[in-house]
Amino acid sequence: MSKEFLWVEKYRPNKVKDCILPDTTRKVFQGFVEQGELPNLLLSGTAGVGKTTIAKAMCDEIGASYIVINGSDEGRFLDTVRNRVRQFATTVSLTSGASHKVVIIDEADNTTNDVQLSLRTAVEEFHNNCRFIFTCNFINKIIEPLHSRCTVVDFRIKPEQSTQLQGEFFVRLRSILTKEKVEYDDKVLAKLIKRYYPDWRRLINECQRYAATGAITSAILVDVADVNLDTLLS
């Protein structure tokens, strides 16, 4: 399936400032971009909150070449991970504008201990020309030797930040649907946001699925709860 067909890829932000995150979290990543240098990072948080998106956005902004290895599939095979990392780390990039390449290990908590130990070694072996960004849902599944070699950023959202983030995504979602020429009902969008928050990836995927019927209206929901639209729009 084409990435351009998938809305989560088509509308994935490629700048940190466009990522929907708590201000304090976004400022941390913006600081790395402004320095033009990334540390080794361990990004921890629930599914769909934007960990991989922010990793790619930082690489795009600083002009770093990067690869993504998914820990849930190929990332479970020691030789595959070791060979891909070594091949990427030792190859000269003619297009990168950054001083380091970046290896993104997505869902690193689904890799085996042997793979994580190998990655720990790679972090040290290739520190002169590579940085590593690990994403995980469960930080306790990351071995301590790998954990200790990374700057940890927690994507946990505080209750007082929820309303602002839901409002930002409400605006983002309306923009996507308008560009895709999909009719929608504001109240239904608000209901969907409340239902899937904070899994933005799931929300966009569900909206694309519903949009296949021609419109996102109350007809797609068995029950539409009352939601204060003014709160989302404020």
Roles of regions detected by a PLM:
Residues 168-180:
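A short, charged helix-loop
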Residues 182, 194-219:
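AAA+ ATPase "lid" subdomain C-terminal helix
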Residues 1-169, 187, 191, 205-208, ...:
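P-loop/Walker A NTP-binding region and its immediately flanking N-terminal helices
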Residues 213-234:
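Loop-to-helix "switch" segment enriched in basic
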Residues 178, 187-201, 221, 233:
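A short helix-loop-helix "switch/interaction" segment in the helical subdomain of ASCE P-loop NTPases
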